[in-house]
C-alpha cells in the first residue's frame, strides 16, 4: 500500500533508528506525497525547568533532551537526505499560567527525577509555584512542523 500523507506528531524523538523511520516513510509514500512531522526546539517550555531548578537545583524534568535526537534545530538534517524538500513552519504560541494546579500536575507527570525531591516537600513547592503564578507565568512554546515532500 502507499499513501499521500504520513503524519508523525511529536514522536520521532522517541524512535531508536530515525534512518529506518525515514526509509519506511519513503517506502509507503506515493510520489508527490508528504510527510508531516511535528517536534519542538531547545527553548520549548524552558521556564518550567527554570522554575523547578529555582526550587531545587537537583531536579531534572527529563533525563533525555528529546529535541537533541529530533528537534527544530536538527530535524532538517535528519530529513533532507530522504526528501526532495524539507520546510520548517513554526507554530507561534505561548502559555500564560495563572493557576498553579495544572502546572504542578504537569511537573509531577514528567519523566525526570522531580518526584524524588518534590513529594516530601509538596506543600512548600505548591506555595512556591502559587507565588510564581500569581501574576501569570509566561511559558515559551518552541514547536512546529516539518513538511517534507517526496
Predicted regions and their residues:
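Conserved class I S-adenosyl-L-methionine
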Residues: 34-58
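A short acidic, Gly/Pro-enriched loop at the edge of an enzyme's catalytic core
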Residues: 1-6
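Short, glycine/charged-enriched secondary-structure capping and boundary segments
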Residues: 20-23, 50-53, 101-104
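A short His-aromatic
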Residues: 13-15
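Conserved Class I S-adenosyl-L-methionine
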Residues: 66-150
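A short glycine-rich, Lys/Arg-flanked "PGG" loop and its adjoining helix->strand segment in the class I
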Residues: 19-34
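Short, polar/flexible loop-turn hinges at active-site or ligand-entry regions and domain interfaces
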Residues: 57-63, 114-115
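A short beta-strand submotif of the Rossmann-like class I SAM-dependent methyltransferase core
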Residues: 8-11
Amino acid at each position: 500500500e502507499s499513501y499521500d500523507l504520513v503524519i508523525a506528531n511529536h514522536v520521532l524523538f522517541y524512535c531508536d533508528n530515525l534512518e529506518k523511520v525515514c526509509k519506511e516513510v519513503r517506502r509507503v509514500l506515493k510520489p508527490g506525497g508528504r510527510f508531516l512531522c511535528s517536534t519542538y526546539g531547545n527553548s520549548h517550555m524552558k521556564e518550567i525547568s527554570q522554575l523547578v531548578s529555582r526550587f531545587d537545583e537537583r531536579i531534572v524534568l527529563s533525563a533525555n533532551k528529546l529535541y537533541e535526537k529530533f528537534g527544530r534545530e536538527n530535524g532538517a538534517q535528519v530529513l533532507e537526505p530522504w526528501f526532495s524538500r524539507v520546510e520548517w513552519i513554526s507554530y507561534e504560541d505561548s502559555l500564560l499560567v495563572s493557576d498553579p494546579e495544572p502546572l504542578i500536575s504537569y511537573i509531577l507527570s514528567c519523566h525526570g527525577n522531580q518526584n524524588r525531591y518534590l513529594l516530601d516537600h509538596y506543600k512548600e513547592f505548591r506555595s512556591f509555584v502559587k507565588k510564581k503564578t500569581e501574576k501569570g507565568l509566561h511559558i515559551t512554546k518552541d514547536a512546529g512542523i516539518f513538511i517534507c515532500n517526496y
